């Protein structure tokens, strides 16, 4: 409601959230990338959008590979409909994620994310990588 009020009070100069543009930009990143993987905290709409970049790219006539891997941290369980019955295994059936490299982490993110990030940092694999600036692809 806050953004609606903001737009009403500032009809000529206001903030707009454009989810279609954002999805198109995510799809452009997927199309231009050599490969991709997903690291998702939680689920819902953002998870669905990022997974669907593969399908959107194909609908635009572009050949793209599935996301090479996916990790999702969530307390949601498909048994009660909390994750819309949309597990990573389901994502592989649509050609979104390579099923051989997917892992659901059923945990509360604030308890396990620091452990995962700390492990990744201390392994040091990032030290020899070139820094990315994805904003350049929108030129």
Regions found by a protein language model. Give the residues of each.
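Short linear segments in flexible contexts
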Residues: 25-29, 53, 135-138
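Gly/Ser/Thr-rich active-site loops/lids in small-molecule metabolic enzymes
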Residues: 11-25, 56-75
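Active-site rim loops that border cofactor/substrate pockets in soluble metabolic enzymes
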Residues: 1-37, 41, 46
């Amino acid at each position: 409601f806050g953004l609606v009020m903001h737009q009403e009070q500032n009809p000529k100069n206001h903030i707009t959230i454009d989810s279609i543009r954002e999805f198109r930009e995510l799809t452009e990143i997927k199309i231009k990338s050599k490969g991709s993987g997903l690291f998702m905290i939680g689920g819902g709409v953002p998870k669905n959008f990022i997974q669907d970049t593969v399908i959107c790219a194909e609908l635009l006539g572009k050949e793209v590979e599935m996301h090479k891997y996916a990790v999702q941290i969530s307390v949601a369980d498909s048994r009660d409909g909390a994750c819309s019955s949309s597990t990573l295994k389901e994502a592989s059936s649509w050609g979104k994620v390579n099923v051989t490299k997917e892992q659901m982490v059923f945990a509360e993110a604030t308890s396990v994310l620091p452990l995962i990030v700390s492990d990744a940092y201390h392994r040091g694999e990032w030290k020899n990588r070139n820094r990315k600036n994805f904003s350049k692809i929108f030129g």
